[in-house]
């Protein structure tokens, strides 16, 4: 599975992240705390972006055999929410430059996540190399069904606004200035 965190805004990087997820047939999670790093309407993005880890996302993380964290914000906290005190059963590949900002005396790094492989680089440097090096895979875990929106929502939520905006702008091309 892929935790899509901080990434550049380049179309090349965007397309490479999609290609990697598709090649690995890996579900992708994203956080509402960060700018989009993966299309939330993609079939491999089964859970809407979140702030606190929902149970469905925790279950998906716990079922993964490999977790590729692409500069995920507070990876240690996410693992703590998903696994509690249990050992992490997946191999963890952590791509991040966070180590440059960690100062041990101030403990301003939240928590240090376990990693089987730590790649000290930005997401856009790692993804093309991973895309080239990885073999195509078929998912071993079924994706959870995307929750349907009620026909007329009782309240306005970020998700209902996002879905309405996506539906209203589907097929509209951005003008270049």
Question: Whereabouts are the PLM-identified features?
Answer:
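Active-site glycine- and acidic-residue-rich loops that bind
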Residues: 6-14, 73-76, 154-160
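Generic low-complexity, intrinsically disordered sequence content enriched
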Residues: 24, 75, 134-135, 147, ...
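Flexible, glycine/proline-enriched loop segments at strand-loop-helix junctions
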Residues: 3-6, 117-118, 149-153
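Anionic-ligand anchoring segments at beta-strand to alpha-helix junctions in alpha/beta enzyme folds, i.e.
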Residues: 1-67, 168-177
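Glycine-rich, acidic loop regions that bind phosphate or pyrophosphate groups
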Residues: 34-144
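A short acidic, amphipathic alpha-helical/loop segment
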Residues: 13-19, 78-83, 164
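Active-site diphosphate/adenylate-binding microenvironment
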Residues: 143-177
């Amino acid at each position: 599975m892929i935790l899509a965190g901080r990434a550049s805004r380049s179309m090349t990087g965007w397309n490479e992240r999609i290609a990697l997820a598709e090649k690995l047939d890996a579900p992708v999670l994203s956080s509402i705390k960060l700018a989009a790093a993966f299309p939330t309407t993609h079939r491999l993005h089964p859970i809407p972006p979140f702030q606190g880890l929902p149970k469905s996302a925790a279950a998906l993380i716990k079922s993964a055999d490999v977790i590729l964290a692409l500069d995920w914000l507070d990876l240690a906290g996410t693992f703590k929410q998903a696994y509690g005190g249990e050992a992490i059963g997946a191999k963890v590949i952590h791509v991040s430059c966070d180590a440059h900002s960690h100062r041990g005396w101030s403990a301003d790094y939240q928590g240090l996540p376990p990693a089987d492989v730590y790649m000290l680089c930005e997401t856009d440097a790692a993804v093309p190399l991973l895309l080239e090096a990885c073999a195509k895979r078929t998912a071993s875990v079924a994706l959870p069904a995307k929750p349907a929106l009620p026909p007329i929502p009782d309240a306005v939520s970020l998700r209902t606004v996002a879905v309405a905006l996506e539906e209203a702008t589907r097929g509209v091309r951005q003008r270049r200035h």
